[in-house]
């Protein structure tokens, strides 16, 4: 398998870039047993600690995924790591000054892709997006987890660290 990875992030209109992204392309037996992993996270703009949440989520996923047993499937490995990361981020918020305001805590969106053999596995929480580029076509592969209050107002419905429970696409 040959994989080329390119990554770029821009802060947009925000004063600080709270995005974090990374990839792991193992060169040893883990390439066959675990595959190639790519992850990205975007902190919520209302929080001063979202950059830390994003960095922890991506770095933790890329490190911990490869520490899971080879007997576990890609889905089981990734889900367990993401759920553990969610628990850790939520606990960080509960122990911090932000414990009563989840919009200020350790919260971020998270999307990851693991490519193993000829299969791409997607794991997604929030409104960061994964697209497939094929020729001149751009196809969105993930669903935004936003709840719309009106045509102009919406809020994030799912994210890492937002609550004790987490539903992962």
Task: For the regions a language model picked out, list residue spans one by one.
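PP2C/PPM-type serine/threonine phosphatase catalytic domain
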Residues: 1-169
């Amino acid at each position: 398998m040959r994989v080329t990875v390119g990554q770029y992030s821009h802060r947009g209109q925000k004063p600080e870039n709270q995005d974090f992204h990374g990839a792991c392309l193992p060169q040893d037996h883990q390439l066959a047993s675990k595959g190639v992993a790519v992850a990205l996270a975007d902190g919520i703009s209302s929080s001063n600690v979202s950059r830390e949440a994003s960095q922890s989520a991506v770095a933790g996923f890329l490190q911990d995924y490869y520490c899971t047993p080879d007997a576990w499937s890609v889905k089981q490995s990734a889900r367990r790591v993401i759920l553990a990361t969610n628990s850790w981020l939520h606990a960080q918020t509960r122990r911090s000054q932000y414990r009563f305001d989840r919009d200020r805590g350790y919260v971020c969106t998270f999307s990851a892709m693991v490519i193993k053999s000829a299969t791409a596995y997607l794991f997604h929480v929030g409104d960061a997006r994964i697209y497939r580029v094929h020729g001149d076509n751009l196809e969105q592969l993930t669903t935004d987890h936003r709840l719309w209050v009106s045509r102009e107002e919406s809020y994030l419905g799912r994210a890492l660290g937002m609550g004790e429970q987490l539903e992962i696409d």
